[in-house]
């Protein structure tokens, strides 16, 4: 069995440092753009650079979210953003949009790419697809049971990593899915 990685979200440089000092194996952060935590404080590029350096000095990894579902107008800015991130060397990018994924693979292929839970990863076929695209890790959809996650594990390459939330927010509404009926009567 693989060791579990304790991955902690950090909303600021101060929180990142506390997570590192208190034993996180990895921390994920969002920048001022291209992440879904629009109301969070998030990190400036300077704070990201300082946080990544601090974490690396303590043997802790840092993953940066770029998990928006992009519109056409976002793509040029994403290119600039990844060019800047390449310089400060995060350990991975957490992405949900295939277009953004393609840009990350082109601009910073040396940085691992993880697929966000926002990509609704609910089956092993999806995991195999992302593995074939070069993703090292896929974050499960939060709605999956342990049995469903175990079935995914059995049907993907051993080298591929699965990440899952142990605790956190779960949206009750999602276009095309009725999570209430899924929970109550197992039909979406």
Regions found by a protein language model. Name each.
Residues 6-9, 27-29, 62-66, 93-95, ...:
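Hydrophobic faces of well-ordered beta-strands that scaffold small-molecule active sites
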Residues 39-49, 96-108, 143-157:
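Active-site-adjacent beta->alpha loops and helix N-cap segments on the catalytic face
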Residues 2-28, 32:
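N-terminal basic/disordered segments at the start of proteins
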Residues 185-187:
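Conserved small/polar residues in nucleotide/adenosyl-binding loops
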Residues 19, 97, 130, 164:
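Conserved, mostly hydrophobic/aromatic
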Residues 28-47, 66-74:
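Glycine-rich, proline-tolerant flexible connector loops at the mouths of alpha/beta enzymes
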């Amino acid at each position: 069995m693989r060791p579990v990685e304790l991955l902690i979200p950090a909303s600021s440089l101060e929180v990142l440092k506390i997570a590192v000092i208190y034993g996180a194996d990895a921390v994920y952060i969002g920048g001022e753009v291209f992440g879904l935590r629009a109301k969070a404080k998030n990190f400036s590029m300077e704070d990201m650079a300082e946080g990544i350096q601090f974490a690396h000095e303590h043997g802790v990894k840092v993953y940066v979210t770029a998990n928006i579902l992009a519109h056409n107008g976002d793509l040029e800015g994403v290119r600039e953003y990844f060019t800047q991130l390449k310089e400060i060397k995060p350990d991975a990018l957490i992405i949900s949009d295939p277009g953004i994924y393609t840009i990350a693979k082109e601009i910073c292929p040396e940085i691992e790419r993880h697929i966000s839970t926002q990509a609704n990863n609910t089956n092993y076929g999806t995991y195999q697809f992302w593995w074939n695209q070069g993703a090292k890790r896929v974050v499960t959809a939060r709605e999956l049971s342990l049995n469903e996650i175990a079935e995914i594990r059995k049907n993907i390459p051993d080298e591929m990593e699965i990440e899952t939330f142990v605790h956190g927010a779960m949206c009750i509404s999602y276009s095309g899915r009725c999570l209430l009926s899924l929970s109550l009567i197992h039909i979406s």
